[in-house]
Amino acid sequence: ARPCAAQWVRTSGGGPGVVRASQGGSGAQARSVQEGAPADVVTLGLAYDIDMLAAVGLLPANWQGLLPHNSTPFTSTIVFLVRKGNPKGIHDWPDLVRDGVQVITPNPKTSGGARWNYLAAWGWALRQPGATPDTARAYLRSLFAHVPVLDTGARGATNSFVQRGTGDVLLAWEDEALMAARDIGPDQFDMVVPPLTILAEPPVAVVERNAKAHGTLDLARAYLDFLFTDAGQRIGAKHYFRPVTPSILAENRATFADTATFDIASLGGWTQVQKTHFADGGVFDGIYAR
């Protein structure tokens, strides 16, 4: 968000002199806004968190239809970050449950990013020949049996893998994996894109109640509109997010590997997914009873 905000300020022709930003986990940020943090816009990891803000009247219930592409200016995918040279030969989801493979992923009860990881695995399992919800549960149960430590958030999981050297593979957003493999540790890590994964759609929205109170509604809308311009799309691509504008994505085809994806709607949408999988007594609780 910060690079986009900086460029927007420079090019907005008399716009605000400063954009204040707060960064953190999607759910924690949503709760902060719900409890009174004066955000004019939110850019979060999953639509469910913005739905929670709509549920208390901070923005319209139809917020996702107010901007293009379901209010998602960039997308990502869930990929595998492995040790340099991929010594465990991890290429696809079945490889994660082989003997001797340790998988690092956070707790999907506490981490929005971990929910994308979990749902990528669940959706893959459901799409296998002869698959049923029971076979998908069995795969997820086996997968989490290979997780040696369940961090509460994505940053903690990344630290476990990158800094503490725990595990053989980190389930991560593509942008984070590309940053690690190209910028942070090109001699330490490789990125593997599985043949089938989930389309992660991190949405944006104007918090209309706050923006109206601050007199910044037009500015807030203009900033989010900027994210969908060619300039905004190129900034996203520079930071390893997949642009939604086809021509800008084509400019960056060398960065982003081809892969088949499925979206959250194909799994029932966030409200249903949250209730089925991550609520107390849901599927995750059933497979991770330790």
Please name every model-derived segment.
Residues 2-6, 31, 35, 51, ...:
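Solvent-exposed, polar/charged alpha-helical surfaces in well-ordered, non-transmembrane soluble domains
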Residues 82-84, 99-129, 144-147, 193-194:
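Short beta-strand->loop
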Residues 46, 107, 174-175, 239:
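Short secondary-structure boundary segments
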Residues 85-91, 110, 123-131, 210-220:
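Short helix-loop capping/hinge motifs at secondary-structure junctions, enriched
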Residues 211-290:
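Extracellular/periplasmic juxtamembrane helices and adjacent flexible linkers that interface
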Residues 128-195:
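Ligand-binding pocket segment of bilobal, Venus flytrap-like solute-binding proteins
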Residues 71-80, 137-144, 151-152, 184-217:
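Periplasmic-binding protein-like
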Residues 1-111, 288:
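N-terminal segment of the mature folded domain
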